[in-house]
From Swiss-Prot:
This is 1-deoxy-D-xylulose-5-phosphate synthase. Pfam families: DXP_synthase_N, Transket_pyr, Transketolase_C. It comes from Saccharophagus degradans (strain 2-40 / ATCC 43961 / DSM 17024). The gene is dxs. The keyword Protease does not apply. PANTHER family: 1-D-DEOXYXYLULOSE 5-PHOSPHATE SYNTHASE-RELATED, 1-DEOXY-D-XYLULOSE-5-PHOSPHATE SYNTHASE, CHLOROPLASTIC.
Amino acid sequence: MFDQIPTQRPNTPLLDVVDTPARLRELSEKQLPQLAKELREYLLYTVGQTGGHFGAGLGVVELTVALHYVLNTPDDRLVWDVGHQTYPHKILTGRREQMSSIRQLDGLSGFPKRSESEFDTFGVGHSSTSISAALGMALAAEMTDNQQQTVAVIGDGSMTAGMAFEALNHAAHADTNMMVILNDNNMSISKNVGGLANYFSKIWASKTYCALREGSKRVLTKIPQAWELARKTEEHMKGMVSPGTLFEELGFYYVGPIDGHDLERLVHDIRNMLAIPGPKLLHIITQKGKGFTPAEKDPVGYHALNKIEPKASITPISASGGAEAPAASTIKKPKYQTVFGDWLCDLAEVDPFVLGITPAMCDGSGMVEFAERFPDRFHDVAIAEQHAVTLAAGLACEKFKPVVAIYSTFLQRAYDQLVHDVALQNLDVTFAIDRAGLVGEDGPTHAGAFDISFLRCIPKIIIATPSDENECRQLLFSAYHHPGAAAVRYPRGTGPGAVIELENQHWPIGKGRELRQGKTVCFINFGVLLPDAIAVAEANNYGVCDMRWAKPLDKDLLLNMAEQYDYLVTLEENAVAGGAGAGVMELLAAEGISTPVLPLGLPDEYLDHGKRSQLLQAAGLDRASINQRINQWLSRHNGAAHDSQIHSL
């Protein structure tokens, strides 16, 4: 048990020689607990040096060791869900010395990534995909007579998503040889592991019982009534002492729950269960943050850590991915998530019909206070984005006004529900789209790069793109009072520090504003890159418009700017393809206006992980790159170099 993060590299003699799972399998079982201890301490040290996901990895140290010890990875397929818990996996699969680069530009990904290692069988970041992917691999093995084993590791939180149960149902129907390990780390499925349940789970995982069961099955299936009676008897015995009846009903052979930190037991049960043909599920109980006292006491707060600076204390990061707030006296800028949460609470005080809905992102979306103050009007539906959106649609049918707080990347999972269940029926649902744009170290799996593009084509929906904290509050209020589907997109973290007007204002839908008059070029800005547009404009005497809405566009303002200026430059933190800039060009083309437009936004590629500033530079959206791209574009149009320079940025 550790109370502090090691600041010096720990002594890990056993781990130092285990650089691949093959070397791990050369150890005796008696050496595994020592390896797990060293692995846990090394994980504490490396995350302290770099920052990153923390609690989940500590909770699966023993499981990771056991899996790579029993399985013949990478020939056997091991599929992790979400990926927060895979740091121990990376350490044991040849990446120990690269851990200092994790979640940094050109370094290791914080999630499994197929291009990074042959041991990363499936790339993840979103939840609840592991069983489906593993089932595909297992079916492929059957079709090619490959004897490989396939194992999916999924947490109890991810198991709340419908996709996981769809995969379980298919796996059982196909009677596919695969194994699912349910990592239950917050007791949401089973409240306790009693002595009787533990005793029976040992029996059910034993070689003797498994052999007896399979032998009886071969004999009794020839006598349907006898087999059915035996199956029901076994089912009722298990149902009395374990929570596995659901999985047995689906068609899985179930063992558990067992202690997920008991290495000897894990090795024994995994090895025995892999010998059973067909679908099987091992239910283990683990503790998130295991081995580090502060994380065991506060698993949510220690979901991740910031890098530990010299002489600095540990800074936990909540599950939202943001560092915990400093003391009130040092707070200068609120996060956009705080702006949203404050607005929602203020609105709920005066509007009894407003409801808050989120798919397992209460803390990350800034809804903790709303949930505490208005519990009857708050719905955390767990990892069920599709359900969240259609739930909102049903509530809107009964004259309530739901606000769905959802990350941009996760809204992708509920697109059909947004189109079919909300927009098509013109229902009054507001979407507070968090994490729009680049998200830094979490990388492409979590980037909100596409929401303007996939929303803009939906009839009747309106899309707001606030450029600062005050615009975020006022556009949320304006969108909320629009009778129909409305979306407001805003980024992770803090804004420029605009003064927030607490009195809500109705801003006209689809109307922008001209902020700066200039010559030759005018910026048509959508969203939080506005300070960069202004800086470049001031250095070059360009004009600037803050559009506020990506849909509907301010037609009058755009036509006026196209008449006043020789060139327009659209700027957004969304994919160029189908984005707001594309909308501007479509509008001008429809009006027969030939003013050249340079659309600046995220390129047609997946940007890797790194600091937000680094990713903006890689995308050509930092101030220097914006200026350079405009210069190059103008030189092509003018036939000569346009030598304007940025000053005092």
